[in-house]
Every structure is written in structure tokens, then in C-alpha cells.
């Protein structure tokens, strides 16, 4: 079985919308050089929608870097339920 390469990265608590746009433009350009590599990014939750929109049509996948361990909604201040994403 052939092994494949996957590269993933997250922002931690860095960046702005402008920073993201610039970073993603460069990433989309560079990823084209490596078509056999799967790439995924995990921005902070507040940027997921904008990042996903900018990456429409590219092979780069988008995910969340933090998800609450709770399975049901509730009063968990600062947490993000997986279903909310």
C-alpha cells in the first residue's frame, strides 16, 4: 500500500482577516506545485467561514482547531460545539 503525505496547520490565536487572505493566496499558489500532497488548514473558529470561502475550488481542506468535548448544547462559555460548525 502506497503511503500518502498530508500537511496540516493551524493558526493558534494569530492572524487577522487581512493576514489570512494573504497567507491563503500564497498557500493556494504553492500547493499547486505538490498535487499529490493533501493539505488542510485549521483557523480559529471566527475565521472558518471566510477561510472556507477563499479556498472554494482549491484542494485545501478546512477544519476547526478547537471543538468542545460536550455532545449537547449548554452553558459552556467559550466552547464551540461540533454541531455549531
Residue spans for each PLM region:
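Conserved N-terminal beta1-alpha1 strand-loop-helix module at the mouth
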Residues: 1-80
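Well-formed, non-transmembrane alpha-helical positions, independent of function
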Residues: 83-84
Amino acid at each position: 500500500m502506497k503511503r500518502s503525505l498530508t500537511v496540516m496547520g493551524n493558526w493558534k490565536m494569530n492572524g487577522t482577516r487581512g493576514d489570512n487572505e494573504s497567507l491563503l493566496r500564497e498557500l493556494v499558489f504553492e500547493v499547486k506545485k505538490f498535487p499529490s500532497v493533501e493539505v488542510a488548514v485549521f483557523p480559529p473558529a471566527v475565521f472558518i467561514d471566510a477561510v472556507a470561502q477563499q479556498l472554494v475550488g482549491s484542494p485545501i481542506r478546512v477544519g476547526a482547531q478547537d471543538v468542545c468535548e460536550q455532545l449537547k448544547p449548554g452553558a459552556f462559555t467559550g466552547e464551540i460545539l461540533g454541531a455549531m460548525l
